[in-house]
């Protein structure tokens, strides 16, 4: 049985990856420091003999006994509401955490995939964004701690591939949504649904003309799986190329929820990207991948998940660190 280490295993994406690799017949070792992850996302796996969980901070030395075939490095705060509160930890997990995982991959002769992000493109001046675009990032802006952590992650991953021969993959993840997101993580979809569930007006920043491209989590996980199983070592965008303005997205959520609340507008945060849409030509040509779940279907699944949560979850305040 092949063995895989997944860091950030109790997070939104990490927990779905644990499910996928258990389903594929792997022995999964999950690792998470639980700063932003939630143990409830993986507790259904605890009874399984092919799943182990370690409560550990990957920015510190990592030891895993026995062989490892793959490492997926997904540990990191991913929401602005989190990384603006814990900027140094965000930088450390992107730098030290990646370094530690790469060292382990070198030792175990494992293939390693790192979770990069569309944020490496910053506030892009090229649209849509392909993998050859270098980006437009403010390294000292409030979002810079996340953007630059991920850019460094890509650089050190390429360096380990070039100079140490580590077999590596880099996925650039665009906006993703689905069950197990935190309602209070501040990102657009859970924020809109949470406000609708509580009977509050939906908050749109700026005039709402800024665009995003939302990919349902199952599609994303399939793309990551295909990339890992390929032999391609340069970055690959995985995301949904169907772009929508945040104002129109808020209107879709209102229609879905049947809520009678209104939309209110607030000032746009500093360095908030004005547009975001992946060019997925590389994923289509190399991996035969493209998203298959349309937004209406994915939104319905996600809304039903959030609505099924205990009502005290609907009004939970963002986590304090």
Where are these regions (language model features)?
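N-terminal Rossmann-like NAD(P)+-binding domain of SDR-like oxidoreductases, especially those catalyzing
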Residues: 1-176, 218, 289, 293, ...
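A short beta-to-alpha transition loop/helix N-cap that caps and shapes the active-site region
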Residues: 37-39, 122-123, 180, 246, ...
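Short, solvent-exposed loop/turn segments at secondary-structure boundaries
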Residues: 85-86, 180-184
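A glycine/serine/threonine-rich, flexible loop-to-helix segment
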Residues: 127-128, 183-191
């Amino acid at each position: 049985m092949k063995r895989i280490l997944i860091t950030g295993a109790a997070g939104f994406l990490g927990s779905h990856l644990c499910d996928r690799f258990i389903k594929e017949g792997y022995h999964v070792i999950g690792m998470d420091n639980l700063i932003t992850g939630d143990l409830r996302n993986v507790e259904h796996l605890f009874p399984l003999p092919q799943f182990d969980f370690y409560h550990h901070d990957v920015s510190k030395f990592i030891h895993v006994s026995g062989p490892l075939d793959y490492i997926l490095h997904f540990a990191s705060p991913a929401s602005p509401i989190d990384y603006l509160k814990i900027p140094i930890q965000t930088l450390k997990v992107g730098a030290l955490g990646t370094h530690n995982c790469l060292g382990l991959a070198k030792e175990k002769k494992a293939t390693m995939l790192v979770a990069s992000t569309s944020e490496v493109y910053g506030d892009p001046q090229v649209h849509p964004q392909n993998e050859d675009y270098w980006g437009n990032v403010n390294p000292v802006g409030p979002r810079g701690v996340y953007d630059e952590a991920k850019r460094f992650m890509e650089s050190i991953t390429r360096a380990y591939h070039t100079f140490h021969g580590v077999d590596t993959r880099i996925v650039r993840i665009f906006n993703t949504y689905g069950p197990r997101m935190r309602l209070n993580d501040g990102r657009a979809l859970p924020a809109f649904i949470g406000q609708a569930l509580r009977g509050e007006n939906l908050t749109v920043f700026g005039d709402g003309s800024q665009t995003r491209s939302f990919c349902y989590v199952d599609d994303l996980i399939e793309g990551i799986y295909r990339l890992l199983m390929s032999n391609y070592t340069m970055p690959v965008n995985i995301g949904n190329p169907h772009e929508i303005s945040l104002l129109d997205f808020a209107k879709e959520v209102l229609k879905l929820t049947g809520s009678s609340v209104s939309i209110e507008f607030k000032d746009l945060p500093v360095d908030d990207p004005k547009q975001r849409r992946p060019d997925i030509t590389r994923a289509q040509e190399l991996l035969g991948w493209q998203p298959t779940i349309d937004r209406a279907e994915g939104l319905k699944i996600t809304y039903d998940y959030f609505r099924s949560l205990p009502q005290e979850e609907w009004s939970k305040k963002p986590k304090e660190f």
